[in-house]
Amino acid sequence: MRNKTLRWKTIVLCSIMFCLPKTPLAGQESSGFIHRLGMEARPQYVFPTNPFLQGENERWKPIQTSFAAHLKYSFKFRPNTCADRIYGGAYQGIGVSLTTFGDKKQLGDPFSFYVFQGARIARFSPRVSLNYEWNFGLSAGWKPYDNYYNSYNGAVGSRMNAYINAGVYINWAFSRYFDLIVGGDFTHFSNGNTKFPNAGINTAGAKIGLVYNFNRTEEDLSKSLYQPVITRFPRHISYDVVLFGSWRRKGVWVGEKQIASPNAYPVAGFNFAPMYNLGYKFRVGASLDGVYDGSANVYREDVIVEYGSSSSKREFLKPGIQHQLALGLSGRAEYVMPYFTIGVGMGANVLSRGDMRGFYQILALKIAVTRSSFLHIGYNLQNFQTPNYLMLGLGFRFHNKYPKVRH
């Protein structure tokens, strides 16, 4: 199962890297973009969210800090273009990082591969702005829980984990070629409930870095008198259809304790979402969400054995398929940027049984493959607190009237 998990996570990351264009938009010259290479240092505080991090570990010391070094390549829309005005100087690229928690024996020193995107929140001058940035990818090189060799580690259950990061920072272009960035961010590591334990690790702290701009000109740093005309956005309704699948682990309550099932359970589902396109950057709508969750309503039962034998044998039992299907309705909102769309959803299952009843929340990243198709990477949370399942799939957009943006 471990090899299967590693294989699928690698496939997902490779798919993301493949879909990120080498030349940002077909038919456009590379001179329409500023190419950048950046380095960052990120000292972080580790939130004590589980006993292992609080000090119940081999050293009996809390794990409170981490440090990460990042190397990043990106391309950016040039200032004073249509794309720059619409998307706020958006940039996107790929990065690698190395993180240490000061305890290589129990946690390892994981390295991450990720895609990222950022843009302006506010501009104070042609050289100074407040920006945001998110990172998403995979981290490897962890020392996971092992019943014999690493039994204290209740935070990390797999050698590869998702890496999610978001932050804000001040960007100062202090010369034609160099930018200084100073800000803060939040990071989350977890395996998406694909393996136990999955307490995860959360950090927050500072980021400071230097960015080299290969082909930026002095004109790019000056205020232009010319403002390109932005085409009026045609408001319309588009329709997204997503098919997804994944696998998950499940904890089953036995009395007052939760017992981890040794099995991995399949998950498959669909979303059908009519979305009203308000403008270049926002969509809102609703979604019909169907799912088959092979772990739903799994239970553990005592089997009576003959007198004098060993203790009762306990098995994890699956109910009929009608107890593992659900149909829900959710409200959706999406933030649309070049190549990437970030979506959130909140809904409730209207046709469901047992532990599938209740509210659910969705966070999703859509990565453009063609004009009307995309990769879908999402996560489903139940009742704002219980990890549910990954949503890895492919989506198609119909009646798409989103205009092409010149830059």
Residues of each region from the PLM?
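Outer-envelope beta-barrel architecture signal
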Residues: 31-37, 86-92, 126-132, 176-180, ...
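Residues on the lipid-exposed face of transmembrane beta-strands in outer-membrane beta-barrel proteins
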Residues: 39, 69-75, 115-121, 134-138, ...
